[in-house]
Structures are given as C-alpha cells and as structure tokens.
Amino acid sequence: MKRIVALQRSVLWGCLLAIGIGGVAQTPPSAEHHHSHKSSVKEFDRWPAGTSPQEIGKRVAERYVQSDYLNLRRTPPTPTIIYPEVCTWYGALTFAQLTGDSALTSRLVNRFDPLLGDRASLVPKPNHVDNTVFAAVPLEIYVEDKDRKYLDLGTSLADQQWQDPEPDGLTNQTRFWIDDMYMITAAQVQAYRATGDKKYLDHAAQEMVAYLDKLQQPNGLFYHAPDVPFFWGRGNGWVAAGMTELLRSLPENHPDRPQILNAYRKMLASLLKYQNQDGTWNQLIDHPEAWPETSSTGMFAFAMITGVKSGWLDKKMYAPAARKAWLGLVHYVDAAGDVSNVCEGTNKKNDLDYYLTRARNTGDLHGEAPILWSASALLR
C-alpha cells in the first residue's frame, strides 16, 4: 500500500511540474547541484597541520588517479569497472572541481575517455545496482564540462535501470540490501543533476522510501538485509551517504522529502551514541568488541558534515562529532594516500563472526572514496 501511495504521489508531483508548480522541469541544476545553503561552521574552519581537507583530499585523489583501473589490478582481473572505483572517481571529480584543480580534473577525464573508445568493453552493463552506479562518473563529468558524449552514456545507463520496472514501480534491480541505497541513488540523482528531469529524483526517492520501510530499525540503524540482523558499518554508511546525496537535490516540496529527512535524522542521532572516542565507528556499529572501520567512518563523516552545513542537523550537537570523525579518519591515511582498516568487500550473511572477522584492508578504494566525499563536503 505504501508503494502504491508513493506512486500516486510521484504522479501528482510530475503533474505539478508539468504545469509549472514546484520547479521548472528539464532545467539542469548548477554545477554545485544542491539547494542547501552553505553555512559557516567554526569547527570546520581550522585544522591541525597535515589534516586539512585540501591536503588529505589531494593526497588521496593523486593516489587514485596514478593507479590503473581497479578491476585490472585484481587477480584474476574482472572484466569491467567496479563500483569502488566509480565511487572514488566521483569523489575525486567533485574534489577537483571544488578546489579549482583543473589539472586534476583533466587527468580524471582523460582516465575516462578510453572507455568511450578502444576500452569501451570495460564499461559495465547496467543489469545490477553495482554496475549501474557507473553512470555517476560520466554524468559528473558532464555536469562539470557539458560535453554531450558523457551525458548520453550516463543517461542511457540510468534509463536502463528503469527499463522494465516491477509492478510497484521499483527498479527490477531492487534486492533490499542496504548497499543499494547508495548505488541506485547515485545513478539516478546524478542523472537529475545533469538533465534537470525530475523523473530521476522520483525514481531515487521512491526506491529510498521502500528501503527505509523495509530495513530501518527502531533505533535508527539499518540491517544489512531483512534476514541479516546486524548493523554492519559500511552498509549503514552506504545508507547515510545515499540519503545525503538525495537530500542535497530533493526539493523542499517533494512529497517524499519529509520521510527521508526524518529517517536521516533518526539514523544520525543513533550514530552519535556509538561514535568512538577517536571519532571512528566500528565494523559492527553496536559491538564495542569490533574494530574501528574507516570506510563507514568516512561515509558517516560525509553525511554529518553535509547535514551540519545544510542546516538539517543541530550545529551545536553534530559539528563537534563531525570534526572528530574527520580527524579520526585522517589518522588512517598514510603518506602515500592509502587508507587502512578498510573492511573488505562483504556480502550479506546471518553470522556474527563473519562480520567481526572480515579482513582489514589497506589501499582499498572502499575507504578512499568516502574520504574524497567528506573532503568535498567540507569544501562546499
């Protein structure tokens, strides 16, 4: 019933747009593509030597752009670009744009261009959430430089995600793993930011609401999946980051915004209770015996920094925690730009020890991406 109501509200929203109420359809947002206001936050103004978002972001972005495609560095290589690279690439692009580093932007775009030519076989087919998220990169390039070839590729992938939807309007890629709440959102919201077409926002919002109804628990946190009752750190990070990206672009009068914003605030309030003294969060958020994990910490930092600066969260309560999260995170970035204590790739499993004993990787792009998102958030 909730999904039917969501569909009806989505149709109403589309009709309002068609007659000019609530915004002008088909008008791409600005390069900064979000409607939240930039707020001065004293906790984000000064940083100890070697910890500024400019310095850390540059180091991590350089480490990324100097490396070969991640899928080709694996043994054996995987056939197409994989999502940790997509998330890092997107973060590096936003960081370069916000710092005015045109040389870095050019290198990031040059890294992409072979995928439009002789290495096109590395572009993943949009048949799974982890593949379709690839759209976020060409769409971000288009937002920044307005070259149509990037738009055509990105919107083609985003459109195919809804080519044959379920009867309730959800994408057929829906699987109710919390990871999806970022993967689906990134592709669809970036398509909106590039085109101004509200259908992409409606896709992302409808999907987000369905996942919120299914996976958010009374304490505000999220199970990895309906049958896996654990509060996995990075999984919850994907949710926090996905809601944040959606809220950055979702208009104040969109019918699904209140539910999504309330869910975001409920989650962030819960996270405050579980933050470690050094600013990190654990591999299993509510397990003190679990180890501090950096990819989740970076994602929560991104969500919290953005919420404070956008006015979604109380500044007095959350700004100190967001600062502590950033400083706790950068402690794990080495001189080469590699991040340690990153949980390895993790499928869902109803087994506590499975989560507690995951490998702690160094140099894993799962950990580098959210550092770039957080650095970008601090610079917006």
Tell me the role of every PLM-derived stretch.
Residues 1-7:
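N-terminal secretory signal peptides that target proteins for export/translocation
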Residues 150-186:
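Asp-box/WD-like beta-propeller blade repeats and closely related beta-sheet repeat scaffolds
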Residues 69, 100, 116-121, 146, ...:
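Helix-capping and short linker residues that terminate individual alpha-solenoid repeat units
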Residues 81-85, 89-92, 124-142, 176-188, ...:
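Aromatic-lined, polymer-binding surfaces characteristic
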Residues 21-37:
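Bacterial Sec-dependent signal peptides at the C-terminal "C-region" and cleavage site
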Residues 178-179, 189-284, 290-301, 313-347, ...:
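Extended ligand-binding clefts on enzyme/binding-domain cores
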Residues 10-22:
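Bacterial N-terminal signal peptides
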Residues 33-86, 98-114, 118-135, 141-144, ...:
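CBM-like carbohydrate-recognition segments
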